[in-house]
Amino acid sequence: MRIVRSGFEGAPMEIRFAEDGDLDAMIRFNRRLREGGRGEEQMTLHPSLPGEARYRPPGFPVYRRMMIAEDGREIRAAMLLYHHNVFIKGERRDFCWADMPVSEGIIDRKYSLAIIQLMKRAAAYQPFLMTMGVGTPEVEAFRFLVKLGWRWRLAPFFFYPVRVTKTLLGLRYFKERPKLRLAALLGAVSGAGAGLGGLLSLRHHLASFLSTCQSAEEIAFDDWADRIFTDALPEYAAAIRSDASTLNIVYPPGDPRYTRLRVRRKGAKEDVGWIVVASKQMKDNRYFGDLKVGTLADGFGRVANAPALVAAGIDHLAETGVDIIVANFLHAAWARACRRAGMLPGPSTYNLFVSPGGPLLRDDSFPPEEIHVARGHGDGLDALV
């Protein structure tokens, strides 16, 4: 696909998918962003999905490519188009996650139109686009998508402070807000943090004790994941494709960043679902400081089994020594499961955005709380693994 558009200062603008020969130009693009003071806006040099090369069957519809805008000399904007499927009322629909769109226009205004042209071309290529994250309405990317007519819905955020005192003292959210910082400090030194930790732990362990399920680590997704997806899919108005082939592309076997937990009934060994978790030791993170953060990344099963899946993820991460566990789930059943497991609601900056050509989040469609999306969808895990 090669589309030529009028570019900047009279130069022709070509919008196309990146090729192997574009690597040096992409390195220069990233270097210019760093030199312009936007070193956090770095485009990946490896656009394919983690398990794509090894685990993607020929012609399988889940894969990721980079689309670029160049002016004949250099790349001026780039984004990842993560090709995927979503099942809406049981019907499979192709779509793309629009991940990491970045433009040289953020450091040089003469290239400010690059991202607009790139996004318009991406929408022409695949009208049904979605993206996750973005941030608050004050963020430039948020305002940009709204101007393009994208619809959005906030995905609730939940956290479980495994080590409450350390979390109170370590979260940047508290440190950067004087009143909350004082409250956190008082809570830590007064013993209130330990008391809260005891209550949360008791609540969670009681739920775990009453659970009829048990979990075990799996090295890969297999036929059992296909059966879970087929069995549970009718209970969701909309759900991202989550069969074994897809999951092994996204969370590949052998990748130490992800842990796959298969959850089954005790004794009967009947599958009830699965959950993927991840953990990372942060270092001067803008949200988590130096805390070790565990994430409930993804999961699937019948909606009635969501509490067992969330509890399994929390149990595993707590045993691995994380300080705090976080999750974002839009579906109401999964949000309830987080609260039931003892997780606390917090301020969320994690949104589901849908392009004008997509069928979700329309006024005449089903409620957003019937859409199952999680932190592991799109590029939402990039900062947490």
Give a label for each model feature:
Residues 1-21, 192-223:
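Conserved N-terminal entry element of GNAT/NAT acetyltransferase domains
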Residues 2-7, 46, 65, 129-201, ...:
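Active-site/acyl-donor-binding loops of N-acyltransferases
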Residues 38, 105-109:
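Short, polar/flexible loop-turn hinges at active-site or ligand-entry regions and domain interfaces
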Residues 79, 99-102, 116-123, 142-146, ...:
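Short, well-ordered alpha-helical packing segments
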Residues 103-106, 302:
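Residue-level recognition of the GNAT/N-acetyltransferase active site
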Residues 108-124, 304-316:
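Conserved acetyl-CoA-binding loop-helix of GNAT-fold acetyltransferases
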